[in-house]
């Protein structure tokens, strides 16, 4: 929730806090349910979203059932993927493979700053 709020503030001028992020844990998915999903070619991943709406910015972190061959599902373990859906460049993304604490927060912010500087 904290990372979602920070990114929304930086990229979308959301002026929000982690408390405003809708949250749902992944704990409701039992091992049996995960096996059923795998047999059907699906997986469950914890996905963070920031979406602009007519009423402002909607922020959420919740489990989503994804196709195993999809881009979001391809990220394994503690790795993370950031996708930005832009007006002019379409969808751009960055992935961090097995990041540590420093890489997760600072690295992501630094990379985004570089991207914004490049496209400005």
List PLM regions with ranges:
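Catalytic, metal-anchored helix/loop core of enzyme active sites in primary metabolism
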Residues: 49-51, 57-120
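Substrate-binding/catalytic subdomain of NAD(P)-dependent oxidoreductase enzymes
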Residues: 1-74, 79-81
């Amino acid at each position: 929730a904290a990372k979602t709020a920070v990114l929304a503030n930086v990229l979308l001028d959301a002026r929000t806090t982690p408390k405003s992020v809708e949250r749902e844990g992944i704990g409701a998915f039992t091992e049996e349910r995960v096996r059923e999903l795998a047999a059907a070619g699906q997986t469950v991943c914890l996905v963070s979203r920031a979406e602009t709406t007519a009423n402002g910015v909607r922020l959420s972190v919740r489990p989503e059932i994804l196709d195993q061959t999809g881009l979001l599902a391809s990220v394994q373990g503690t790795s993370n993927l950031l996708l930005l859906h832009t007006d002019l460049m379409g969808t751009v993304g960055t992935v961090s493979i097995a990041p540590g604490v420093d890489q997760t927060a600072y690295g992501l912010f630094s990379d985004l700053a570089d991207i914004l500087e490049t496209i400005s």
